């Protein structure tokens, strides 16, 4: 991206910048805006006035470190001090008071709330303003409507009916004449007719009765209130009626806000000042005029495209935090008013400090924020699976959430890619499933204009006049409503020097159409081939050779890759790996130059300008997804370092580059059906040499409570009735020792809960004690923390958190080492995913002509139908790179250089590798990229040449250890009496419709009957079956129906249908009627 040396250099912006910019705007502007709105609290009886000032507010440094907040489950926050003034009679007091704590964003762009990293996603919403649309009714007549959307998301509609009357629909039920609405908003009929372009249409529809209703503002308000609130009878005009209307209608439906006012002025060509943020009668009349123009053909028939990004706005972290701050200040106002009343009852002299007390009033701020972060749908637990996930999570944009769409009701059009998304929202990166198209990711060069909430994309200006004025071409950021006026050359730039004219005719984008036009007519040009993609999409090499659906899967699966114990750089990459790793902040970067004094696994000591600085390292810390975060020092003692150099590397990074997987030797061939339907065959080398071994940390916690009788639980090693073997790892306090190896069922923390025995269970001696001395004999129940199934591992940390003597929480962290095994999920970077089906001894794997056994065998049938041919280019180029000891970083869309550029590159590198290593099999002209390989079991060559190569394969977080599950007995659902669902609840395996068909196909009637009735929901039979199975007896037959049949009968009864069944006696054919 450089040109003429360093002149006019363009770099990719910081990936976390969007979150930081939003938070800075909140701190610098939004806090002052909300404090300005805080009213003066007056108490007229006692001549008291309390006021907060926005000027000169201060935020203190957080009182605890980020690490301690996570360790002790606290909120990382900063105290806010504001100037306050209290007028009491003739006494004026000024003080700087603390009004509470505000959560502070850390260097990852996240917040720490109660010890958990959380992040706020950017929401994309319909912008406030007016939108017009026309649609045909069932008779084929065009209906024109205008929708006014307020800043709060409230909607009002303007419509013209068949009789050419104009109505305003203020909610779903009621519609009100436009004249009544305008009059209620303060206009008289004369003003209305003076301010519209079609007065004759306005005069044509009201009859005498309606004209009477709008004679005065009071009558119009009464009429409006009657229709809006659906109230009948005679109403009398009053102030309270006006207040109710103000609160219920005007505040919710008529506040346009700053963005809405700008949109309204633009759409209707008005010149109302920006500070008029409410809907005015002038707006309503101008909107109605436009609607009449559309209906009667005098206006332009321009339906608004609701999916165009110019009609959308971004609600960033700043907007959401500002709303919550306003809410907290509202609560603070009520609390201060209560305190003022209390002060006068006690007749004490108030000060600003006594009105805002830390215990009752200023706690409102932090509780408001903690509630927001805990319950708001767009506040999510920060995904820390790997460094890529940490970088990408803050760049998500979502249409879901309050005021937005829902996954069940969103239309296809609102999910689709729109031409205005180019360079702003990635056309590939979105979630799979019900939310497809509703959550997206920002393109790598996109930025958010926080003032107006639009997404901007950068372009190079290449217009002739500007080129004369300035030698250096300038980068312009275009918002979605501006780029419609430009001819934009698509990303076809060959050179990074954008002054070069490339071809006479180029493909371009203009007004959402794709054209081919002369180079002279181009205004701006895209600056980078990656410009249209998100980070996930930009990490896929040869993405232009893949189907978009597979690229989508790939960008999602890279976020699920587990950091491996020994990471490895990819041979074939795109060049974005370094910046992704850097912006994820998992590595330690030198902030100043100096000399390394010493390094160990916990800290690095750096001597810089006479001072020794200690730089702490992350050591086996658990992430939110149970992966292991760990930093390893990469600088030797005594080495001089420069500012910006890497001192220690985090998980899944090598040499400052992202390293999510491993380069392994793969072959595309079928092998005895073991790679049928995306299954993958692997060599035991991947297990024994710890190639795909990862570390995972599980957290287990237990808390002591006070029982209903008032006695406290206690943590102890002295637990009766338990085998010594289960308690072997406990120290004298009853907590597991650091470094001990624990297995399933072992006690991690011993705990006893006291219980008062019931009267009947007393022994005689206890009765005597109670009668003579009044002593209660207590018994204890064992409620220890046991290690659940699949939790075996090494204890690496134990935490005691003691808020008060009786409330103790103990957390135990256990490290697990997991090798790759059958059932684990692996994936490439092209959406080629599969499950490990078999681990073969290396001598049985197919081997190359130089005797090297293959590491993985993929099914070749997974490539043609899925059209992800990029994996073939990657594996062949990876083989050449491995042999030549080279790494490649390839920008996408290299076919713009020449036809078949990717293929030519791969073949030339394979030829080079063949020459260099003197191995003719690496590149054979008859079948380039393929080679004859041998069956490891027999030593015979396979019939056809096979494609081999080095691919970069990731191990995903979907691991068999966390999925596999079995149940013999367990909990049942209360209503249907069938086993509950899910591994977490120790549930059963559902036999559904298709499984029943499969069993029916084999005619196994008895097995079907057992599965569907006796074993499932027959209350008596299921206990007897267990007994019969253990003793090898015959399963008894039961005549009464299973529980699900009873549920059906009860449901029929609720519909007034009685259902009974009859039993016919075999002896005398008497009918015995029994109730179900």
Swiss-Prot record:
Segments traversing the membrane: none
Compartments reported by the entry: Plastid, Chloroplast
Entry EC no(s): 2.7.7.6
A GO MF term: ribonucleoside binding
Annotated PROSITE patterns: RNA_POL_BETA
Family: Belongs to the RNA polymerase beta chain family.
Summary of subunit composition and partner proteins: In plastids the minimal PEP RNA polymerase catalytic core is composed of four subunits: alpha, beta, beta', and beta''. When a (nuclear-encoded) sigma factor is associated with the core the holoenzyme is formed, which can initiate transcription.
Protein name as annotated: DNA-directed RNA polymerase subunit beta
Gene (name only): rpoB
